[in-house]
UniProtKB/Swiss-Prot annotation:
Keywords: Amino-acid biosynthesis, Aromatic amino acid biosynthesis, Decarboxylase, Lyase, Tryptophan biosynthesis. InterPro entries: Aldolase_TIM, Indole-3-glycerol_P_synth, Indole-3-glycerol_P_synth_dom, Indole-3-GlycerolPSynthase_CS, RibuloseP-bd_barrel. Transmembrane segments: none annotated. One of its GO terms (biological process) is L-tryptophan biosynthetic process. This is Indole-3-glycerol phosphate synthase. CDD domains: IGPS (cd00331). Pfam families: IGPS (PF00218). Pathway: Amino-acid biosynthesis; L-tryptophan biosynthesis; L-tryptophan from chorismate: step 4/5. One of its GO terms (molecular function) is phosphoribosylanthranilate isomerase activity. The keyword Lyase applies. It catalyses: 1-(2-carboxyphenylamino)-1-deoxy-D-ribulose 5-phosphate + H(+) = (1S,2R)-1-C-(indol-3-yl)glycerol 3-phosphate + CO2 + H2O. HAMAP family: IGPS_B. Its EC number is 4.1.1.48.
């Protein structure tokens, strides 16, 4: 398979250039300043303190590798279902071209519940960080495979200055070394290789020994069953970002409860 990540990043740069014309920085800053903030990291730690898994439940219509995951896609209903069944936070895809996401989906999901929300997108520029705050996000994703370390550090600092939490995502030990330069406690291990889209949960299990105890490990992608959850919890991983398994279920929140609680 060709390198999907490079294609996505190229599209992101085109989108940013167009967005700067339609929504200038000063306009975005006004929108961002009007947004309230929810404690993303605190919500995860609250679940841990209560002895529960902390689930970041994803609102995702489609993916490049799997196509459309959910035909009847109503973000507000999905968000409410997750909140009612024990999710700690939400993750909402805002990438339009590859994941059929939307900023509007994030706004609708956040308005439907009280959970903190992660903007799930491919962030490569400070403009997108401000854009995330303006659309109501409480956290952003920084993907180590898409960013060099100095830029990742700068994007994190800007995010924190806006009151946004940061989840830094890695897939291998080289990316992990770069990610540990950041201040965020949230280290996501993506079990899916973003350059090939191949997935194995052994990716998370094979990297745990290199992560300091003061970081919160978030296992991402490929968590599809109760057995996968139990395997992670046995290894000391208690924070999960899950989308596909929930999106394919008739009732996403009920599937969350079945897998985790």
């Amino acid at each position: 398979m060709s390198d999907i990540l490079d294609k996505i990043i190229a599209v992101k740069r085109e989108e940013i250039a167009a967005a700067l014309k339609s929504a200038p920085l000063e306009e975005l800053k006004l929108q961002a300043s009007a947004r309230d903030s929810r404690d993303f990291v605190g919500a995860l730690r609250g679940k841990h303190a209560a002895g529960h898994a902390a689930v970041i439940a994803e609102v995702k219509k489609a993916s490049p590798s799997k196509g459309v995951l959910r035909e009847r896609f109503v973000p507000a209903d999905i968000a409410r279902s997750y909140a009612e069944h024990g999710a700690a936070c939400l993750s909402v895809l805002t990438d339009e071209q590859f994941f059929q996401g939307s900023a509007r989906y994030l706004e609708e999901a956040r308005a439907a519940c009280n959970l903190p929300v992660l903007r799930k997108d491919f962030i490569v520029d400070p403009y997108q960080v401000l854009e995330a705050r303006a659309m109501g996000a409480d956290a952003i994703l920084l993907i180590a495979a898409a960013l060099d370390t100095p830029l990742m550090v700068d994007l994190e600092a800007y995010a924190h200055s806006l009151g946004l939490a940061v989840l830094v995502e890695v897939h291998n030990r080289d990316e992990l070394s770069a990610a540990l330069e950041l201040k965020t406690p949230l280290v996501g291990i993506n079990n899916r290789n973003l350059r090939t889209f191949e997935t194995t949960i052994d990716t998370t299990l094979g990297m745990l020994d290199a992560i300091p105890d003061d970081r919160i490990v978030v296992t991402e992608s490929g968590i599809l069953s109760r057995a996968d959850v139990e395997r992670m919890e046995a290894a000391g991983v208690h924070t999960f970002l899950v989308g596909e398994a929930f999106m394919r279920a008739e009732n996403p929140g009920a599937e969350l409860a079945r897998m985790f609680f």
